[in-house]
Amino acid sequence: MTQLSLSRRNFLAASAAGLAIRPWSRVLGANSDIRVAVIGVRNIGKTHLMNFPKIPGVRVVAVCDIDSDVLGQRATEFEKQFGAIRKYTDLREVMDAPDVDAVVLAVPNHWHALGTIWACQA
């Protein structure tokens, strides 16, 4: 019997990415962008922000981080690419935003489960 080389971390990351996509509150047409909020913008979140412009049909509309200094720095840095970006310090407010279609949870591990549950409920 062979063992899979899938680590717990990779499994959880893939699962969280799939579950974090919110159900759309509007019908998306063929030309509609997916509006994304990135929660946690220090390291992994910054990497996601740098790569979203390479994905057609994806637009970052909001960023969230508990550290207001990092939040302001990232928002200023990436508004040149994405246009106006709303800033949040509480991820619960992001989940309530009506124009966010998907969220990226680039947060510490202990926030993954609760953040994913809130995203699915939104």
Question: Each PLM stretch: what is its role?
Answer:
Residues M1-A122:
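N-terminal glycine-/serine-/threonine-rich beta1-alpha1-beta2 phosphate-ribose binding loop
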